[in-house]
Amino acid sequence: MAGDAVAAYCDASVRRDIDGLLDTLAPDAELVSPLSGRMVFRGRADLKVLLGAVYGALRDWQWEQQFGEGDMRFVVGRGRVGGLPLDDAMVFELGPDGLIHKVRPHLRPWLGTSVFALLLGAKIARHPGVIWRALRG
């Protein structure tokens, strides 16, 4: 996975290096919420808040092999949240600049995802502007 934005994203997320992770994102990058299809988080400032909360809640996180080529990539991740297993099938869309322009997480199983939603919701609720902008679509 070495040498591209997705590999760098995965490496930074495992280390909880949010600034390093943000370096892999385009300035106008967006993340489509897997918990609420209506919410789309945009821009590095809002993504810093969101991704800090996301990777701060996960334990023993690891990514497996990267699939895809060109501007579409797919990586499977797994770890724990609140002591429960959580898996992610993350789809990344890259721009012509090689940076990540869109992130689409797909989480399972249900119980781990539910606990994750509760933990993440409590952390993100401290930032109502981030929530408001994500809901505006």
Regions found by a protein language model. Name each.
Residues 1-137:
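C-terminal and inter-domain tail/linker signature
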